Amino acid sequence: MSEINISAAAVKELREKTGAGMMDCKKALIETSGNFEEAIDFLRKKGLAVAAKKAGRIAAEGLTAVKVDGLTGVVVEVNSETDFVARNARFQDLAKDIANLAVIAKNIDTLKTSKMQSGKSVEEEIIANIATIGENLALRRMDILEISEGAIGSYVHNEVVPNLGKISVLVGLVSNAKDKAKLEALAKQIAVHVAGNNPQSIDDSSLDQALVERERKVFFEKSKEEGKPDNIIEKMVEGRIRKFFSEVVLLQQNFLFDPKLTVAEVIKNAEQELGAEIKIAKFIRYELGEGIEHEEKNFVDEVAAITRS
């Protein structure tokens, strides 16, 4: 069976069809004597054994996805090992389907056991796709935003297809404003702002106090090294803390679409225009792979290894 001549074109076609790795596609065609449909089934049947082998590999690529359903929105992150797989329609459909289920599931544990259209749970569907695609895949995280009234704005940066991309943001504005279109437009603009400016909290009080104290200590030590008197140091530190807040607190940041105003001032102006109070209930910002250790790869060596196999 190993003597069968498998063309590069056939391997390429099978890879495009299934998203599986090149060597897996070649092996599938050899094992099935070049029968294309049987090769697809062969890849699917590899299942759990393949998934177990792939599970130890770093999955830091992939996609973030958003789904908004009325006054509920979710963001999920589904990881793959390579950007090539993230551009595959099969993987994109998987991420989109998981996001759709997340709106109903509301938490990641329930989401993992939720049933997909195939009848498999999300976890089982991911394992099946590991077998077919040939890379480690993972549902890494999800978050949900729910409001009682108002509008949810969403934005996806570096969008590859609608609602899927590298950075996904949701912003929930609570308000009883009658003009929903203007409220939704404001929520959308703030979502774009959050994507670009990466705030750490909505206001001062919700900012991690450990982070504030760490910054305060750094500023104090730096000012002390400059040989300033203690009373001057205290004023300098407070000034730097205020600047720090303006950089990381959403309401204090200069608004992306009108830097002369802070986000708080933009909201205040909108309240006057719409005749109703507007409050940012929550924002979610997912950036693909943040916090994951990336494995450095040499592409030339990787291709050479495949060629030698």
From Swiss-Prot:
<dbReference type="InterPro" id="IPR036402">
    <property type="entry name" value="EF-Ts_dimer_sf"/>
</dbReference>
<keyword id="KW-0251">Elongation factor</keyword>
<dbReference type="InterPro" id="IPR018101">
    <property type="entry name" value="Transl_elong_Ts_CS"/>
</dbReference>
<dbReference type="GO" id="GO:0005737">
    <property type="term" value="C:cytoplasm"/>
</dbReference>
<keyword id="KW-0963">Cytoplasm</keyword>
<comment type="similarity">
    <text>Belongs to the EF-Ts family.</text>
</comment>
<dbReference type="Pfam" id="PF00889">
    <property type="entry name" value="EF_TS"/>
</dbReference>
<dbReference type="InterPro" id="IPR014039">
    <property type="entry name" value="Transl_elong_EFTs/EF1B_dimer"/>
</dbReference>
<protein>
    <recommendedName>
        <fullName>Elongation factor Ts</fullName>
    </recommendedName>
</protein>
<dbReference type="GO" id="GO:0003746">
    <property type="term" value="F:translation elongation factor activity"/>
</dbReference>
<comment type="function">
    <text>Associates with the EF-Tu.GDP complex and induces the exchange of GDP to GTP. It remains bound to the aminoacyl-tRNA.EF-Tu.GTP complex up to the GTP hydrolysis stage on the ribosome.</text>
</comment>
<feature type="region of interest" description="Involved in Mg(2+) ion dislocation from EF-Tu">
    <location>
        <begin position="82"/>
        <end position="85"/>
    </location>
</feature>
<keyword id="KW-0648">Protein biosynthesis</keyword>
<dbReference type="InterPro" id="IPR001816">
    <property type="entry name" value="Transl_elong_EFTs/EF1B"/>
</dbReference>
<dbReference type="InterPro" id="IPR009060">
    <property type="entry name" value="UBA-like_sf"/>
</dbReference>
